[in-house]
Amino acid sequence: MIEADRLISASGGREEEVIDRAIRPKLLADYTGQDPVCEQMEIFIAAARQRGEALDHLLIFGPPGLGKTTLANIVANEMGVNIKTTSGPVLEKAGDLAALLTNLEPNDVLFIDEIHRLSPVVEEVLYPAMEDYQLDIMIGEGPAARSIKLDLPPFTLIGATTRAGSLTSPLRDRFGIVQRLEFYNVKDLTDIVARSARCLGLDMTEDGALEVARRSRGTPRIANRLLRRVRDFAQVKSDGRIDGPIAARAMDMLDVDNEGFDFMDRKLLLAVIDKFLGGPVGLDNLAAAIGEEKDTIEDVLEPYLIQQGYLQRTPRGRIATPRAYAHFGLQRPDEG
């Protein structure tokens, strides 16, 4: 199973990125949720603008689908500067990064997604650029090679990552501002769904937005994806208006339950409960029981179940929590 194939995957494809771009907020005033982050960024941006300086380099980390790219674009808009976007895997050679840096205007933003995947060679070039706004370039080869320094205009590097722990210490230490994005609560997600519905010209009630939000796993990207599928259902099966009952029927058809679980989430939990008496069960046995790769279980299925308190990893194996039993209306063996 590929994560991107799941309706409730937080990863987004290129086509979805284009659609989401049309409904993204452009300014902090339009950005819903992440209140501590927004409050801090508002102050940092205002101070940098008053001084006429580039904003300090910014690292944004957190689970996928929470709005790291959106926030980077908002920072550029609020600063009134251009943004150039790339990603860690794309920057294979030092020259790739140098080409981007030398084309920046004063105070521009360079946004690097998946910055934890930068190659060591590219990272070495980035250090003096971030610290001194200088670019060290090697001219020629062999004994005749020499290093020259190019001055760069002041700029802001914004790095985004889902794995802050994978960043090297020298790179992480060069960011003056570090922000973590958290999963969204249902209220904020409801507001996001309602705003997206307005941007798409949909007739949606508050309870319809709530129904989509509560099944979106705290993630705006999933909420917007579910909204588009609910729109399709309402268009074909009703008069196009999205209310609570219509949204619930659409979600049931899509096999996304009240907690945002899909078939694979439920299959894993029920395997632990039914086949292994609630656990503990080792990863090898669990993978064989549900017919999935071990990496898929560890990287795709388990994280959300653990975060929400439905599954525990222990030294002896996986254990289903009381909350998992309650979700399926089952009684724990020790309660029988």
From Swiss-Prot:
Q: What highest taxon heads this organism's lineage?
A: Bacteria
Q: Where is this region: Large ATPase domain (RuvB-L)?
A: 4-184
* Annotated DNA binding sites: 313, 318
Region annotation (Small ATPAse domain (RuvB-S)) ranges: 185-255
Tell me which residues bind ATP.
23-24, 65, 68-70, 131-133, 174, 184, 221
**Annotated Pfam families:** AAA_lid_4, RuvB_C, RuvB_N
Keywords attached to this Swiss-Prot or TrEMBL record, sorted alphabetically, are: ATP-binding, Cytoplasm, DNA damage, DNA recombination, DNA repair, DNA-binding, Hydrolase, Nucleotide-binding
What interactions and quaternary structure are annotated?
Answer: Homohexamer. Forms an RuvA(8)-RuvB(12)-Holliday junction (HJ) complex. HJ DNA is sandwiched between 2 RuvA tetramers; dsDNA enters through RuvA and exits via RuvB. An RuvB hexamer assembles on each DNA strand where it exits the tetramer. Each RuvB hexamer is contacted by two RuvA subunits (via domain III) on 2 adjacent RuvB subunits; this complex drives branch migration. In the full resolvosome a probable DNA-RuvA(4)-RuvB(12)-RuvC(2) complex forms which resolves the HJ.
The function of this protein is: The RuvA-RuvB-RuvC complex processes Holliday junction (HJ) DNA during genetic recombination and DNA repair, while the RuvA-RuvB complex plays an important role in the rescue of blocked DNA replication forks via replication fork reversal (RFR). RuvA specifically binds to HJ cruciform DNA, conferring on it an open structure. The RuvB hexamer acts as an ATP-dependent pump, pulling dsDNA into and through the RuvAB complex. RuvB forms 2 homohexamers on either side of HJ DNA bound by 1 or 2 RuvA tetramers; 4 subunits per hexamer contact DNA at a time.
Q: Which NCBIfam families match?
A: PRK00080.1, ruvB
According to UniProt, the name of this protein is Holliday junction branch migration complex subunit RuvB
Q: From what organism does this protein derive?
A: Aeromonas hydrophila subsp. hydrophila (strain ATCC 7966 / DSM 30187 / BCRC 13018 / CCUG 14551 / JCM 1027 / KCTC 2358 / NCIMB 9240 / NCTC 8049)
This chain is encoded by the gene named: ruvB
